[in-house]
Amino acid sequence: SLKDYQATTFDTADAVGTTAKQIQNSTADWMRLGESMNQAAESAKDANVLLNVSEFEGIDEATESLVSMSQAYKDLDKMDIIDVLNNIGNNYSISTDGLATALKDSASALVTANNDLNEAVSLTTAGNAITQDPSKVGAGLRTISLRLVGTEEAKQELSDLGEETDGMITTVSKLRDTIMDATKAASSDGKGFDILDSNGNYKSTYEIMQGLADLYDNIVKKDKELGTNNLNLLLETIAGKNRSNIAASILQNRDMLRSVYEDAQNSEGSAEKELNSYLDSIDGKMAQLENRAQEFWFKVIDSETI
């Protein structure tokens, strides 16, 4: 019953450092998105954990980001997502909420382009290293992943999003040839970097950007030696003029790309550890106190109605 559910929210709120009222409101938000009461109660708990281990201002922002990410990464438990964001947010120059904000815009496009969460977080962290503007990084990654798909549909999607599509290549063979030609001089075998794997399938956006990042120093060196302009050609091909700074930030941070990808895979339990620190803090204790006051009045009113 609703009354029984309300009674359980006080313990849930205590466990994550918020109030039963916020858990109840949050549960209602998730139910409006089509979740059952049990699912929504669990999602509300997770959203409040994200809020308390990040720098989000309020539960609405945390929920909005978690909705986008959990819809994109349907095979992952919401806490698995929060673990990765918290772990990388604690160890690199991007905040947990910064990662979530960027992925709110880019997760769907990145999943379509075969990037798992660890790859998406790596691209986001490296893309933010120079710009330090997560919302622009999210929009930039969405653009990069769609431009690297190289289809008319991807071009239309970018156009619908208000992104520039000038010079966008919309056939896979031409996109492949352009990137190989621009990286021939810089590659050790003289063949250039291939955006397709040995089976002829697309590499993920992360695999492509990591491969190009590994060649970055050599591309710059060869451009100087030969008087070519392959770096600019590459940046405009994969990102367009308006988002090329995001692509440049990724290509200049090859070691970060790799280390974030490796660290992200070892994130289990990260959010719970951070949450425990929050619960021991003044803010955490105050939230629990407020929650217990609400529970007291809930029981008083409940006993008076019997």
Predicted regions: what is each one?
Residues S1-D83, N87-A100, L110-N118, I130-K136, ...:
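A short, structural motif
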